[in-house]
Amino acid sequence: MISMGMTSKGQNVDGAPAGNSSSEWIISSSSSPFQANKRYSLDPPFGSDYSPPASPQNELDPLSSYFLNLQSEDNDVRKTAIEYIINTLSNPDNEKLIKNHLPMIVVLSTESPFDDISEAFTNFLKPIQEKYHIPKQRTTVFTSESQLPPLNTDDELTRKLFQDVFLQHGRVNHLTRILGWHPQYLEKFLLAYNTIMRDPGPLPLHWRNYIGILAAARYKCSYIIALQEHEFLMNNGDARWLQGIDHIPAKLKNLLKVIELLAHQPWLLPKLDIEYLVKGTDAWSIAELVHAMVLICTFLSLSGFVFCCGISPECGLSESNNLSSSFSLNDSDCEIEDTAATENTAKVMELLKNRRSQQQDDDDDDQLHDRQQDFHNAGDDSQSSNNNTTTTTTTTTTTTTTTNTNTTSNSAGGGDSSSSTLSQSSDRMSDFSRYIGNNTMTHTDFDVSSKLYNIFSAQEYSWREHGYELVSRYFPDAAPLLDEEFSFVYTMTYYKFNNNTDIDTLPFRRAVWYYVQRVKGMLHDDYNYQEVNMFLSRSLKNFVKKAVCFPETIKRDDYSKLGYSLKPDEKCHLSLLAVCSHKQASLLYGLYSVMNYQNRR
């Protein structure tokens, strides 16, 4: 349960991976929120004169071992720990202990799947809530708590997964809670995530966390950054690295260009000669580089998902839990009305019902269409058949110069809005710049007619035929789990569309998947790109594009006005389709670059 540090095997004294050997892997450790480092200041709503507790191994803390015992499957062990903690904190002489442990108590009251824990600490907080100005805790600012899967859910698989996560980490974080809508996917996601982040592998554990920080910073995702900074310290990472990239090893700095390209213009990565990464005194082994590519793409994807679902900061980990500093959101959980949703939903339902009978006709007519033009049109929002919003599309360009982030977000249909957004205010931009430095590239649309780069053919380099093989060669445990994750998201269906049942949503899901990869410059010869504009409304395309290109610009309006009547769990499913397709596309660009280098040697 407790992070006991790492073996030194596979690391130099400075914590860098040793040499180029992929046979020396780092042994896993796990983290607990009850080992918060004092670097994190307490959230303003609780006061500004104290910090979350230091490691529970601190002998001066009489409650440390009891808090850790809450992460026990044994009911009696938990009961004893709860009684001791509550009795100790109820002593009027122990007010300082309450202050020191308040974030932890809030977490236990709101993020535990065990009723004995959540009820005990919720009851403890009630009489002191006003005294300590404890804010209302929210999992997401887009959806009411009542619509989320309960932590003590009756669904057996979801309950087991929530309990396993709590027993390992001491909390069911907001990201996990949201994914509880889709427990079968959550199970596969956790297996893959734990493998690439915590199991033995080419890179040290704290390097994995830091690469996650660098990737999340590209999309200004403070939620992911806070989680990874915390776990970085749990894994004995050098706290100086968290001051920014000026304090990290040259070997890690060399990866910044790759991260920048994968985040914003991955189609330029094949033009980058990665020989500088694998040669010299700060060289990456191929195994380390493959692991890094998987990590980068994972955290770019996760950052997009956080913004898609409006996930709120974690108590005790973020620099501020005062939502007013990050969101301009009323307390109302009322959905923003989407006037076009009913009509568009009826249209797409009819299309889905009739699609099977039309498939043969489409196959016969394929040769009549210019596939290159269809591919181009799929990326043009103005070509969407469901023009239910007045969206201005982003102008394509043949240049590789970057565009201003604010300009990009507005041209993509975001505009100025008073709706809540997860992007940070301008006075907090420096928080991300320390992890970005001079690598200031932002999104520019892929131009299908550009002479400066090529369309990426999925037939010439695909995940199944090529990417999987490369990952399995250098990181064999990860390859099948990534494959399962991709396959499951693509095929996952409940045969429902809003309240309509027995609906085959494959054409709709397929349109989302291939639209994302079209935005990333990837062509699938065997897909009819006319389906993109047939099934996706302009506003939905706008949401999906933001999710995979500049997710920090997503607003509550974007989430609420997708052009279709979708339930929150269906919007989560839609978001997963988008970000997992993005993850696969980015990973293919990264792995293709590695293969290119190997072929040239």
From Swiss-Prot:
InterPro entries: AhpD-like, Sestrin
Region of interest called Disordered, as start-end residue ranges on this chain: 1-58, 355-425
Polar residues compositional bias, start-end: 1-11
Sites where a glycan is attached: N20, N322, N330, N387, N388, N406, N438, N499
Stated role: May function as a negative feedback regulator of TOR function.
Sorted UniProt keywords: Cytoplasm, Glycoprotein, Nucleus
Pfam families found in the cross-reference section: PA26
Name of the protein this chain belongs to: Sestrin homolog
Family: Belongs to the sestrin family.
GO BP terms, alphabetized: cellular response to diterpene; cellular response to L-leucine; cellular response to leucine starvation; negative regulation of gene expression; negative regulation of TOR signaling; negative regulation of TORC1 signaling; positive regulation of macroautophagy; regulation of response to reactive oxygen species
Entry-linked Gene3D superfamilies: AhpD-like
Localisation: Nucleus; Cytoplasm
Biased composition regions of type Basic and acidic residues, renumbered to the chain: 368-379
Superkingdom to which the source organism belongs: Eukaryota
